[in-house]
């Protein structure tokens, strides 16, 4: 169910903009085939939902024959950035990943090759893991240019006795976005300035830094899990969207496809509390995404600033509950309080939009 201004993940958009609406649908339906003979690995994953049929994973890998903990992979697989990108969808405590993850890492996966390095289990550094690779940069679509993006993460994970566990990671993304026009826009103060690129087919750099941390422990209340992640950097997008490329053909040389380079900030927190030994879990999530940290409030939409609703920040408070019938079946109810930055100069965003969402989901995993 969504309020009148909401966007839901299943079904069509609202047919009556003055009223709330509801939709029923298949959000995810996946089947994964995996192979592992100790040295060679491979996987194919297919997704079926109310939008059609597509593939999710398609990769092969070769492990080192000595420790079998380091690996070289090639194909389509999760991008090694942060913690939530690679977190299993079937284990998510909220219906969707954080806003900035959905915007910057559509489908979570990309075409590429990645090297994973880990020491043997008896080493004092066995809790460390380094992932680094080169990727096409436009999700699971076919590659459209000759530039490759670098993505890497150094992570650590370690148990604390038999009662707790911690983890942390630092991630880096260095890539480029294709600009099909002769113009591009960059921030100067609180407004965009137009740059003449001199030719079509140039590129603008996108660069992200990420930090993530996880901590879980057991107590008389049950298992408590805390997770946090933050990203900062620059993201080229178009006037109408700050999302990462997610297309299978290069955009055309049209004014609306000119790139805007935005400095961004995004972060999110999870608190998941199992209720003792019962099958219930309570979930609290806070999610913030500011696509342009150089402007705020009524600076957005100002005359000759070239800013728009795309530059407004958004945040979400999510509250939910999970009931695990068994290890295969779980029921999830989750309510999202969505908030947007307001500007008197952006039509439709003078006040907070009515776009809260209630999701009730039944999941079966086998």
Roles of regions detected by a PLM:
Residues 1-139, 144-151, 155-162, 172, ...:
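Outer membrane beta-barrel
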Residues 17, 62, 164-174, 180-366:
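Outer-membrane beta-barrel pore domains
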């Amino acid at each position: 169910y969504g309020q009148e201004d909401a966007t839901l993940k299943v079904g069509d958009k609202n047919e009556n903009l003055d009223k709330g609406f509801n939709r029923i649908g298949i959000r995810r339906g996946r089947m994964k085939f995996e192979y592992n003979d100790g040295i060679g690995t491979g996987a194919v994953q297919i997704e079926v939902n109310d939008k059609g049929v597509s593939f999710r994973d398609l990769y092969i890998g070769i492990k080192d024959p000595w420790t079998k903990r380091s690996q070289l992979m090639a194909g389509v697989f999760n991008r090694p950035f942060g913690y939530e990108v690679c977190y299993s969808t079937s284990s998510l405590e909220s219906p969707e990943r954080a806003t900035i993850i959905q915007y910057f890492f559509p489908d979570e996966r990309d075409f590429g090759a990645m090297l994973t390095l880990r020491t043997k289990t008896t080493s004092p550094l066995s809790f460390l893991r380094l992932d680094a690779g080169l990727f096409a940069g436009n999700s699971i679509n076919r590659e459209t240019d000759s530039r490759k993006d670098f993505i890497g993460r150094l992570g650590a994970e370690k148990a604390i006795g038999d009662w707790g566990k911690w983890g942390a990671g630092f991630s880096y993304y260095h890539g480029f976005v294709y600009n099909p026009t002769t113009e591009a826009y960059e921030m100067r103060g609180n407004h965009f300035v137009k740059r003449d690129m001199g030719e079509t087919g140039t590129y603008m750099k996108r660069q992200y830094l990420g930090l993530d941390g996880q901590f879980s422990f057991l107590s008389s209340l049950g298992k408590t899990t805390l997770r946090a992640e933050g990203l900062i950097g620059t993201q080229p997008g178009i006037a109408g969207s700050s999302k990462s490329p997610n297309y299978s053909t290069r955009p055309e040389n049209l004014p609306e496809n000119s790139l805007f380079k935005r400095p961004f900030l995004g972060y999110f927190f999870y608190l998941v509390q199992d209720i003792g030994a019962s099958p219930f879990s309570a979930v609290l999530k806070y999610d913030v995404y500011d696509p342009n940290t150089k402007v705020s409030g009524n600076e957005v939409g100002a005359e000759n600033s070239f800013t728009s609703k795309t530059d407004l920040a958004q945040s979400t408070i999510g509250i939910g509950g999970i009931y695990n019938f068994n290890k295969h079946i779980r029921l999830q109810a989750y309510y999202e309080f969505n908030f947007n930055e307001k500007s008197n100069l952006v039509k439709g965003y003078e006040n907070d939009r009515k776009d809260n969402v209630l999701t009730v989901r039944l999941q079966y995993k086998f």
